[in-house]
Curated annotation (Swiss-Prot):
The record marks 31, 82 as: Important for tRNA non-discrimination. Homodimer. One of its GO terms (molecular function) is aspartate-tRNA(Asn) ligase activity. ATP binds at residues 220-222, 229, 483, 535-538. HAMAP family: Asp_tRNA_synth_type1. Belongs to the class-II aminoacyl-tRNA synthetase family. Type 1 subfamily. CDD domains: AspRS_core (cd00777), EcAspRS_like_N (cd04317). This is Aspartate--tRNA(Asp/Asn) ligase. Its main location: cytoplasm. It is an enzyme of class 6 (ligase). GO terms for cellular component: cytoplasm.
Length: 591
């Protein structure tokens, strides 16, 4: 081998030993006739010293520059007193170099590797192979590897089988757009890249592989946000003959073991919260429990007020009026309130009412707000008591359709928690359970809240009679306001699956066309089964403290779903298109 040690492995126990290092020149310094090279590899940095006594080697060291690839042999020795660097794993020692081979030269990188505050993300992605040399970027990918190793080890030890499922499959309605792949041998037909291995893992349960897992690539052609990529990685798990409590117990223990092994963080038993409670108290089905702010319903106190902004939603069965108390924030300037008003507008809110509680003992005179004149004093007192308002607080109000109020105040709660530094702890995991089976679309039709293969907590007859109130056997693990993973008990009887399809407007012909293979499988002794999938990229993002999943993926796409490094997607030649039976239409020019 070309090296004896990684740079980050060097320490005082190797004092006096000869070592050979391979890596990149991170930094070069010339101090009074002595040359120092900081050599970098994936494990860290090591300081190598060259003195003029070895003239040939010293001359080579004098010629090297940043990012040259080098091989160095030398002897480990303690650093002089006062020269120890506590910020480096190898900071107590240095290597006295006596052999230096330049394995390759390097041009000056397009950006410095020691700081990148002024480097645009597109430049970093264009030269990702250089960006990944940064110690902090390498650390994220190393942690990702540790995470997948821990998960594989746990699942292997618990009897799970790692089984691969197809990448080329057929399009099924799973919520997002599919990436389509034209078939050369079947003219006019297309494969789809899988949005998840959902149906294949269910078929593996029918086949008798009762504990399956896969670290799977998934693909969704959707609009991108900070936590989305067109291709992403899923920790996919499915089991037979286990109920919700069993599956949640196995996967919860996996996550607790993972955090202990990788970050030395211990979680207690995860609390459970229903979907209804999460939406009511936090305005989100993935609540961030680190933030000690809650939404409080006050519609009952505002039904009779003349202020239609409040009384309208308060009397609407589909409306909601909720309050959000922020302790000690009554001094918030109007400009900040206006900023928050614009913020909730993103979620459909038409405004943001507020009351500043300056001195409650003075009654209405001690309140600062444009809305108190519309609310009778007795109702106002009930509202302020209910939210726990005291002097120095500000109370925000949302009034609209329930969905808009929950989403707007829920998002405001998160924003306030971070802006005002209200977080009470570093980690707050929980399970959210008892999700609705369906959600109502704007046209009144129903769509599956999770996916159409989730089992309901009722019979097919009860489901058909009142689908809008049916609850599902679904469960999500949430951490710090982010959905880590979601799963459910699946439908394993054909009649129930067809009942769900009918509610979703999928008739018999479409059922057979798109899901005939699944319905066939359910006829041949499908066992009770269920599972869960974790988003690996999100998990790594949280565990590394990264701001985006692009920071924890080796070669991510941009927010426009492109790779600026390889220039993908790109054009293909006419011959390849003909073989695929595809003809491109010229796009009309914009006037």
């Amino acid at each position: 081998m070309m090296r004896s040690h990684y740079c980050g492995q060097l320490n005082e126990s190797l004092e006096g030993q000869e070592v050979t290092l391979c890596g990149w020149v991170h930094r070069r310094r010339d101090h009074g006739g002595v040359i120092f090279l900081d050599i970098r590899d994936r494990e860290g940095l090591a300081q190598v010293v060259f003195d003029p006594d070895r003239a040939e080697t010293f001359a080579k060291a004098d010629r090297v520059r940043s990012e040259y690839v080098v091989r160095i042999t030398g002897k480990v020795r303690p650093r002089p007193a006062g020269a120890v660097n506590p910020n480096m794993a190898s900071g107590a020692i240095e290597v006295l170099g006596y052999e230096l081979d330049v394995l390759n030269q390097a041009e000056t990188p397009p950006f410095p590797l020691d700081e990148y505050s002024d480097v645009g993300e597109e430049t970093r992605l264009r030269y990702r192979f250089i960006d990944l040399r940064r110690p902090e970027m390498a650390a994220k990918l190393k942690l990702r590897s540790s995470i997948t190793s821990s998960i594989r080890r746990y699942l292997d030890e618990n009897g799970f089988l790692d089984v691969e499922t197809p990448i080329l499959t057929r399009a099924t309605p799973e919520g997002a757009r599919d990436y389509l792949v034209p078939s050369r041998t079947h003219a006019g037909s297309f494969f789809a890249l899988p949005q998840s291995p959902q149906l294949f893992k269910q078929l593996l349960m029918v086949a008798g592989f009762d504990r399956y897992y896969q670290i799977a690539k998934c693909f969704r052609d959707e609009d991108l946000r900070a936590d989305r990529q067109p291709e992403f990685t899923q920790i996919d798990i499915e089991t037979s003959f286990l109920d919700e409590a069993d599956i949640m117990g196995i996967t919860e223990n996996m996550i607790r073991k993972l955090f202990k092994e990788v970050l030395d963080v211990e979680f207690g038993e995860l609390p459970h919260m229903t979907f209804e409670e999460a939406m009511r108290r936090y305005g989100s089905d993935k609540p961030d429990l680190r933030i000690p702010l809650e939404l409080v319903d006050v519609a009952d106190q505002l039904k009779a007020v003349e202020f239609k902004v409040f009384s309208g939603p308060a009397n609407d069965p589909k409306g909601r009026v909720a309050a959000l108390r922020v302790p000690g924030a009554a001094s918030m300037p109007r400009s900040q309130i206006d900023d928050y008003t614009r913020f909730v507008g993103i979620y459909g809110a038409k405004g943001l009412a507020y009351i500043k509680v300056n001195e409650r003992a003075k009654g209405v005179e001690g309140l600062q707000s444009p809305i108190v004149k519309f609310i009778p004093k007795e109702n106002l007192d009930v509202i302020l008591d209910r939210v726990g308002a005291v002097d120095g607080d500000i109370v925000f109000f949302g009034a609209d359709k329930a969905k808009i109020v929950s989403e707007a105040l829920g998002a405001l709660r998160i924003r306030l928690g971070h802006d005002l530094k209200l977080l009470t702890c570093e980690w707050a995991p929980l399970w959210v359970v008892d999700f609705p089976m369906f959600e109502e679309n704007d046209d009144g039709s129903l769509s599956a809240l999770h996916h159409p293969f989730t089992a309901p907590k009722c019979t097919p007859e009860e489901l058909a009679a009142n689908p809008a109130v049916a609850l599902s056997r679904a469960y999500d693990m949430v951490l710090n306001g982010t959905e880590l993973g979601g799963g459910s008990i699946r439908i394993h009887r054909k009649e129930m699956q067809q009942a769900v399809f009918r509610i979703l407007g999928i008739d018999e012909a479409e059922q057979q066309e798109k899901f005939g293979f699944l319905l066939d499988a359910l006829k041949y002794g499908a066992p009770p089964h269920g599972g869960l999938a974790f988003g690996l990229d999100r998990l790594v993002m949280l565990m590394t403290g990264a701001s985006s999943i692009r920071e924890v993926i080796a070669f991510p796409k941009t927010q426009s779903a492109a790779c600026v490094m390889t220039q993908a997607p790109g054009a293909v030649d006419a011959k390849a298109l003909r073989e695929l039976h595809i003809r491109l239409r010229e796009q009309p020019k914009a006037e």
